[in-house]
């Protein structure tokens, strides 16, 4: 599917944002570990979260989708033995968290995925879980899928996690730690990539009744065994998805209200609003959401985005239209996402005539020179590339997004929502 974007100015819209992908993943998995049934309200129903839910079903978890919610019934025995490999598509979050989840139970589980997922590393997670007694067999390439988990539960003890490439390695170990046979001391190497997602994991563990103590900046002590509590959970709206709508306001001199969102969000990507303010936008929190207003004139920025790497494609588009040179730093881990996001963003900016330089850990972008592309924008099978470059098409004509259906990974209603910017 190909989508042609028509330029527009002076957008004024009020838009609803779907549930958070990151929180939905974690809520499903913590519910699977719980001692009772859970109801998750406002879950994101998208390719990635469906992959997580389907994998849990293969492991014996009851998952029942309903309009506006999902019911999760944990199995009496952790876990059932799958008759076939558990296929995870291109979902890195599903992969990292489910490997740890499987290791908390008993059984033999094989995980595999799409060719790109087979290129995304899991070695740091495997090494950490092996310190707690888990056994793994990477059946083709060491440290990558396909991979067997030979599960006999986790012992207690000390574990050191190298999460400098992905905070998901640390989140996975922390989520599994309460299920171990004895107290687990989790330490990690710094800096952690995308640390706010780790903070989200800890907050959600606490909400489900798990006791832990963070006695150092890089250490958490988790008493074990503990049981997660079941119950009701409401998933907040996705700040990452909202960012494309905020960027649309910023780029077109618009006024966009997104809801339901709160300044108390667990999501680190909500801090992207502060970046928009630095670039010249006005941000106002209202009763049920946040409003972004812009004149369309943007200032360049020089930023370390290690803690919100998913915002890099969006920021790169804004930088392409800002008045000067912008730099995005400390995001080398973007090279092992759904695509090599640094290379992909740089390549597609070139199609818009935007001078840019790909750095080992980031991008340098000279704004103000964007022109209509002569060829389609290739999202590189990456949902965030497709959505970010759709925003660029609001400012310059002729932008066509190839393989536009890739947005279903995280924001299935993106194109319908995007159309509402014009109404």
UniProtKB/Swiss-Prot annotation:
Q: So what EC number does this one have?
A: 2.5.1.19
Localisation per UniProt entry:
Cytoplasm
Q: Report the active site residues.
A: 310
Q: What is its main location?
A: cytoplasm
List the GO terms this entry assigns under cellular component, sorted alphabetically. Answer: cytoplasm
Q: What are the protein's UniProt keywords?
A: Amino-acid biosynthesis, Aromatic amino acid biosynthesis, Cytoplasm, Transferase
Q: Which family does it belong to?
A: Belongs to the EPSP synthase family.
Could you tell me what this protein is called?
3-phosphoshikimate 1-carboxyvinyltransferase
């Amino acid at each position: 599917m190909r989508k042609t974007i028509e330029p527009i100015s002076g957008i004024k819209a009020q838009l609803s944002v779907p549930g958070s992908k990151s929180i939905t993943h974690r809520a499903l998995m913590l519910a699977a570990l719980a001692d009772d049934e859970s109801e998750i309200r406002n879950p994101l129903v998208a390719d990635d979260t469906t992959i997580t839910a389907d994998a849990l079903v293969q492991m014996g978890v009851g998952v029942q989708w309903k309009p506006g919610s999902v019911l999760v019934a944990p199995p009496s025995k952790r876990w059932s033995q799958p008759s076939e490999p558990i296929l995870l598509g291109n979902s890195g979050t599903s992969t990292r968290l489910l490997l740890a989840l499987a290791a908390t139970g008993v059984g033999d589980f094989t995980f595999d995925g799409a060719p790109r997922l087979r290129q995304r590393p899991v070695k740091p997670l495997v090494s950490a879980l092996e310190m707690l007694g888990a056994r793994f067999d990477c059946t083709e390439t060491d440290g990558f899928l396909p991979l067997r988990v030979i599960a006999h539960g986790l012992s207690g003890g000390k574990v050191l996690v190298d999460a400098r490439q992905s905070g998901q390695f640390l989140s996975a170990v922390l989520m599994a730690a309460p299920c171990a046979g004895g107290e687990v001391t989790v330490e990690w190497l710094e800096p952690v990539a995308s640390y706010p997602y780790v903070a989200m994991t800890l907050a959600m563990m606490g909400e489900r009744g798990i006791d832990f103590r963070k006695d150092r900046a890089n250490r958490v002590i988790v008493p074990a065994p503990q049981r997660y509590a079941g119950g009701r959970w409401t998933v907040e709206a996705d700040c990452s998805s909202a960012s494309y709508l905020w960027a649309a306001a910023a780029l077109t001199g618009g006024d966009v209200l997104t809801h339901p969102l709160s300044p108390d969000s667990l999501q680190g990507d909500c801090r992207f609003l502060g970046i928009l303010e630095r670039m010249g936008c006005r941000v106002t929190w209202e009763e049920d959401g946040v409003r972004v207003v812009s004149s369309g004139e943007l200032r360049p920025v020089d930023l370390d985005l290690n803690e919100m790497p998913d915002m890099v494609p969006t920021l790169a588009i804004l930088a392409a239209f800002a008045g000067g040179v912008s730099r995005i730093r400390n995001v080398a881990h973007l090279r092992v996402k759904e695509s090599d996001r640094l290379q992909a963003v740089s390549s597609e900016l070139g199609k818009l005539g935007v001078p840019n330089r790909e750095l080992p850990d980031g991008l340098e972008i000279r704004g103000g020179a964007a022109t209509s592309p002569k060829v389609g924008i290739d999202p590189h099978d990456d949902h965030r590339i497709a959505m970010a470059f759709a925003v660029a098409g609001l400012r310059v004509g002729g932008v066509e997004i190839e393989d536009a259906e890739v947005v279903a990974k995280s924001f299935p209603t993106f194109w319908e929502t995007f159309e509402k910017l014009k109404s």
